[in-house]
Amino acid sequence: MTALSIRKRLALEVARKIRNNRKEMHPLKQLFWECTQRCNLHCKHCGSDCKRTSEVKDMPAADFLRVIDSITPHVDPNEVNIIITGGEPLMRNDLEEVGLALYRRGYPWGLVSNGLYLTADCLQGLMAAGLHTITISLDGFAGEHNWLRGHPDSYDRAMDAIKRLVHEPELTW
C-alpha cells in the first residue's frame, strides 16, 4: 500500500470539512410527505398521476413514523416542519393519528389541501392532533378556479375552508 501524498491528504481533508459544513450549514428544516396519490379533483395543471382511486397503495402510517423516528436523533424536532401532501391528504382516514404521533414526537406539522374535505369537524380533529400549518390551494376567481380544478363547487368549498381557518389562532400560516 502506498502512502497518500500531502496533496491528496489535503484534498481529502478539505472534502471532509466541506461535507461536514454542509450538514451544519443546511440543516433539515422542512420534510414533505406525499402520503397518498389519491385525489378528489382532476386539475388541468397538475402533473401528477393522482386520481380518486390509485393503483399505488398509500404508505402505511407506521412506515412513515419509522422514517421519522430514524431522523429524530439527528435533528431538533421542533425545528423541522413536516408538511403532508398528496394527492389530497384528507382522503386518508388516519391523518389525525399521524398528526398526533408527530405532535407527540415534538414535530410541528401541517398539510396542503384543496379544502373540499375540510369540514368543521375535520378541522377540529386536526387541530386536536396538533395541526400547526395548513395551505389551501386557490387558483383565482371562481370561474377560473373551478375550470382548473375540474369541479363546479371547488372554489366555494376552498373558500369555506379558508374562512374556517381564519378563526383558528393556533395556526401559524
Tell where the protein language model's regions lie, with residue ranges:
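Alpha-helix N-cap and loop-to-helix initiation/capping positions
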Residues: 56-59, 63, 149-157
